[in-house]
Curated annotation (Swiss-Prot):
Interaction with host CALM1 as annotated region, ranges: 8-43
Motif (PTAP/PSAP motif): 450-453
Motif Nuclear localization signal: positions: 26-32
Ranges for region Interaction with membrane phosphatidylinositol 4,5-bisphosphate: 73-77
Motif (Nuclear export signal): 16-22
Region entry Disordered, spans: 103-124, 432-492
Name assigned to this protein: Gag polyprotein
Tree of life domain: Viruses
Stretches the record annotates as PPIA/CYPA-binding loop: 213-221
Annotated organism of origin: Human immunodeficiency virus type 1 group M subtype F2 (isolate MP255) (HIV-1)
Description of its domains: Late-budding domains (L domains) are short sequence motifs essential for viral particle budding. They recruit proteins of the host ESCRT machinery (Endosomal Sorting Complex Required for Transport) or ESCRT-associated proteins. p6-gag contains two L domains: a PTAP/PSAP motif, which interacts with the UEV domain of TSG101 and a LYPX(n)L motif which interacts with PDCD6IP/AIP1.
Asymmetric dimethylarginine modifications at: 404
Region (Interaction with Gp41): 7-31
Modified residues (Phosphoserine): 144
């Protein structure tokens, strides 16, 4: 048993006895498990001394791993113990058996990925639709009907909207000029747009010929001629020549060059079909910020500008053209905020909850302002008290230190206090109220005179003038104001 137990010693044995058999369990690995593992290895015709080293444990793991699916419980337990021992030899801390198995699986996955990457690097680079056959020859695979159908469907539904360009770029990955012409020929309608595209291609082909003149003299044997603009466009070159240019050493990527020309023409077409300028994209008062960002970047994609200019438009116009609510939030974030931070901060702006919160904040500010104004007004209206005893300000008579004045503090007479003083004083109209005689000064003293306008003369009695006698008689008959004749007539 001593030989079997000598697999671990010292610190490694202590680490072995700290590892649990199951996650959260009480039982831990002991020395008896090493003895049992040695006996099981002998039963499976394996050398027990392999348990003493890291490499030996790795060999045992490789040997047992292939039999795990069909093996018994004893085999699985032996495999688990060897995996734990493998990490103990490497002095890697594991808490239980499951953690050791997870680490081993992760390690094996990384190793497999590295091997696949090495194998891929050794193989010849292959770009669809040009692939390498079994004999090692580069052959062409035509675009599938599904790819062409997807392209036609995009044109029919989107009608040269900005998202057509990335769709074309994805479908034409690695395509030859012949494949690109096939995609363009499948477009049935929009012939005006296709004519614009042809004009752009011809302009770019002429520019290519100007920048790449033909070298004088014959072409050396075994060497391909240099492609002209029409060769890149696929009108004067064969499929085999295109494949040779694309796979040669050094290669001439005629497919990628032609693809750039087409995308340049598509940008002009998208600009024509989407005349809205990026400057006109502004967020509505109640429009969600997410919808505004979608419209902004959709229009930005159609802009014919460099990436630096588009980045500047995104940093400046996206904030500048937002509504006031979002603009306040975005300016508070600062110029270095990411798009994710902007959309998170402006989420819910414009909705009923946001409006209610803004209104509550405004009302709270207005209320606090009114309270502060009231407090300040009360402070400004502080009365200045005056002492009736000495006549000085700043204290009242109760607290006056001067000798008490004798008599009434108002009239100066003795025998009564100021509250009982009958000295005449002005009423609220500013008139003196006479004491003990007559009516108060705020009552009318005389009988009011009538203030009605004189009776109008309508001209009915212009020819009749009363005689002086009648006037005198009328005056005599009029009773005095204090008489009762107006009520009882001629009653004696």
């Amino acid at each position: 048993m001593g030989a079997r137990a000598s697999v671990l010693s010292g610190g490694k044995l202590d680490a072995w006895e700290k590892i649990r058999l199951k996650p959260g369990g009480k039982k831990r690995y002991r020395l008896k498990h090493l003895v049992w593992a040695s006996r099981e290895l002998e039963r499976f015709a394996l050398n027990p001394s392999l348990l003493e080293t890291t490499e030996g444990c790795k060999k045992i793991i490789g040997q047992l791993q292939s039999s795990l699916q069909t093996g018994s419980e004893e085999l699985k337990s032996l495999y688990n113990a060897v995996v734990v021992l493998y990490y103990v030899h490497q002095r890697i801390d594991v808490r239980d058996t499951k953690e050791a198995l997870d680490k081993l699986q992760e390690e094996q996955d990384k190793s497999q990925q590295k091997e696949q990457q090495k194998a891929a690097d050794k193989e010849v680079s292959q770009n669809y639709p040009i692939v390498q056959n079994i004999q090692g020859q580069m052959v062409h695979q035509a675009l599938s009907p599904r790819t062409l159908n997807a392209w036609v469907k995009v044109i029919e539904e989107k009608a040269f909207s900005p998202e057509v360009i990335p769709m074309f770029s994805a479908l034409s990955e690695g395509a030859t000029p012949q494949d690109l012409n096939t995609m363009l020929n499948t477009v049935g309608g929009h012939q005006a747009a296709m004519q614009m595209l042809k004009d752009t291609i011809n302009e770019e082909a002429a520019e290519w010929d100007r920048l790449h003149p033909v070298h004088a003299g014959p072409i050396p044997p075994g060497q391909m001629r240099e492609p002209r603009g029409s060769d890149i466009a696929g009108t004067t070159s064969t499929l085999q020549e295109q494949i040779t240019w694309m796979t040669g050493n050094p290669p001439v990527p005629v497919g990628e060059i032609y693809k750039r020309w087409i995308i340049l023409g598509l940008n002009k077409i998208v600009r024509m079909y989407s005349p809205v300028s990026i400057l006109d994209i502004k967020q509505g008062p109640k429009e969600p910020f997410r919808d505004y960002v979608d419209r902004f970047f959709k229009t930005l994609r159609a802009e014919q500008a460099t990436q630096e200019v588009k980045n500047w438009m995104t940093e400046t116009l996206l904030v500048q053209n937002s509504n006031p609510d979002c603009k306040t939030i975005l300016k508070a974030l600062g110029p270095g905020a990411t798009l994710e931070e902007m959309m998170t901060a402006c989420q819910g702006v414009g909705g009923p909850g946001h409006k209610a919160r803004i209104l509550a904040e405004a009302m709270s500010k207005a209320t606090s302002t009114a309270i502060m104004m009231q407090k300040s007004n009360f402070k400004g209206q502080k009365r200045i008290v005056k002492c009736f005893n000495c006549g000085k300000e700043g204290h009242i008579a109760r607290n006056c230190r001067a000798p008490r004045k004798k008599g009434c503090w108002k009239c100066g007479k003795e025998g009564h206090q100021m509250k009982d003083c009958t000295e005449r004083q002005a009423n609220f109209l500013g008139k003196i109220w006479p004491s003990n005689r007559g009516r108060p000064g705020n009552f009318l003293q005389n009988r009011p005179e009538p203030t009605a306008p004189p009776a109008e003369n309508f001209g009915f009695g212009e020819g009749i003038t009363p005689s002086p006698k009648q006037e005198q008689k009328g005056e005599e008959q009029a009773p005095p104001l204090v008489s009762l004749k107006s009520l009882f007539g001629s009653d004696p």
